[in-house]
Amino acid sequence: MVDVHFSDEVPPLRHLLRAGPQAQIAIEGLTYLSANLIRGIALTPTQGLARGARVIDTGQSLQVPIGEHLLGRAFNVFGDPIDGLGPLKGMKRSLHGQAVPLHQRTTGTDILVTGIKAIDLLAPLERGSKAGLFGGAGVGKTVLITEMIHNIVSRYDGVSIFCGIGERSREGEELYREMKAAGVLNNTVMVFGQMNEPPGSRFRVGHAALTMAEYFRDQAHRDVLLMIDNVFRFIQAGSEVSGLMGQLPSRVGYQPTLATELAELEERICSTAHGAITSVQAVYIPADDLTDPAAVHTFSHLSASIVLSRKRTSEGLYPAVDPLQSGSKMLTPSVVGQRHYQVAQAVRKTLAEYEDLKDIIAMLGLEELAQNERQTVYRARRLERFLTQPFFTTEQFSGIPGKMVSLDQTLTGCEAILDDKCSGLSEQALYMIGAVDEAELEHQEREAQEVEEIGQ
């Protein structure tokens, strides 16, 4: 936090101020302390700043570049390239944009297929809406969002923008290399506010990425896929800024303006007649508490919520999507169709009944259940394993080739399990596969091999 005294004209709030020997220290004015005193947040490290140092008003707010020439490049919050490929020239725009007026917004019912069974079945994503990946530390949020980037971007016609807020620099560098190797970097823009940067930088980098996304939607008339990792770090940076500003904290130590700051970011993500911005956001859940204010306020902005479970992670069920807590407003017969809706409801009902029976099984054993209850358990355990899936992004670690599964294959597999057509297959045969045909084919090959061995 920096207090600046102006002897003459005081600049408007949100103007970018410069200080330091080479004007390398960037400050954004946030509030007036008196007629001539303004308090701002440093967007760069303040090393070299001294009391009495000269401060220059740049005469404008923080701006980032816009245009087609951004594709294939990586930037920081100032729009400066950080990929070592040289500087950029061209138009710039203030990152403090306004949300699209209500009468200019459009809504649709187009589904964005991810190729991930658990998501496409239970929490389908809507084109031009927002979806959240909720989970505590180490449950696979970044892996899942990286897999979604891999699956969607490779067959996506629009522009993809990845915004890293307060996450590890190593993960950003790995993602950059992976996208370059996959040949999708030329249609992608990456913007980073790394965890070692000041809170002001992390607090504004989301707006920088959105400003670039709005250009592609409104001027280039293209659809945009905006990936944000992690929204909680944006809220956390706002909390740090609020504390430095001297504001009294609200519940659980968050800033009193949490809802307003989050809405300023989220409400800019929408569809218009020119194009759509579809956003997938990772949201860290402190202490796995879904009632945390950061999670609660984020939930209210989303059309699909994908909750990752630590319990499923401990059981080795990846992706660790909780089928009972995850959901989407798109999962209605009028949008996804009667077949998809009925299969999803049947899967949820079976898994919910199994969850209720777990305590009885733990105390009395599976043998004490009625025949129909045992059948429910067998189906649920097979469904749990069928909804696991090997990822392309973890192929180098697991040694299992990644699989992209169509929605029809997912529905067919779930129907087969619910109708007991897979009762001849072991639970393990359905674990970490793509379509159910793979398990059936492997089962047939094993039977043929056993017959051949007996014949010999």
Curated annotation (Swiss-Prot):
Molecular functions per Gene Ontology: ATP binding; ATP hydrolysis activity; proton-transporting ATP synthase activity, rotational mechanism; proton-transporting ATPase activity, rotational mechanism
Indicate the transmembrane segments per the record: none
- One GO cellular component from the entry? proton-transporting ATP synthase complex
UniProt-listed CDD domains: ATP-synt_F1_beta_C (cd18110), F1-ATPase_beta_CD (cd01133)
Tell me where it mainly resides: membrane
SMART domains noted in UniProt:
AAA
Top-level class of the enzyme under EC nomenclature: translocase
Which segments of the protein form a coiled coil according to its record?
A: none
Q: Which InterPro entries match?
A: AAA+_ATPase, Alt_ATPase_F1_bsu, ATP-synt_VA_C, ATP_synth_F1_bsu, ATPase_a/bsu_AS, ATPase_alpha/beta_chains, ATPase_F1/V1/A1_a/bsu_N_sf, ATPase_F1/V1/A1_a/bsu_nucl-bd
Q: Where does ATP bind?
A: G135, G136, A137, G138, V139, G140, K141, T142
Q: Which domain of life is it from?
A: Bacteria
What Gene3D superfamilies does the annotation carry?
2.40.10.170, Bovine Mitochondrial F1-atpase, Atp Synthase Beta Chain, Chain D, domain 3, P-loop containing nucleotide triphosphate hydrolases
Keywords attached to this Swiss-Prot or TrEMBL record, sorted alphabetically, are: ATP synthesis, ATP-binding, CF(1), Hydrogen ion transport, Ion transport, Membrane, Nucleotide-binding, Plasmid, Thylakoid, Translocase, Transport
Any Pfam family from its record, for instance, is: ATP-synt_VA_C
Look up the EC number in the record and give it.
Answer: 7.1.2.2
Q: Where does this one sit in the cell?
A: Cellular thylakoid membrane
* Membrane topology according to the record: Peripheral membrane protein
Catalytic activity entry: ATP + H2O + 4 H(+)(in) = ADP + phosphate + 5 H(+)(out)
The protein's role, per its UniProt record: Produces ATP from ADP in the presence of a proton gradient across the membrane. The catalytic sites are hosted primarily by the beta subunits.
| Family the entry assigns | Belongs to the ATPase alpha/beta chains family.
Q: How does it assemble?
A: F-type ATPases have 2 components, CF(1) - the catalytic core - and CF(0) - the membrane proton channel. CF(1) has five subunits: alpha(3), beta(3), gamma(1), delta(1), epsilon(1). CF(0) has four main subunits: a(1), b(1), b'(1) and c(9-12).
Name of the featured protein: ATP synthase subunit beta
Species per Swiss-Prot/TrEMBL record? Acaryochloris marina (strain MBIC 11017)
Q: Which gene encodes it?
A: atpD
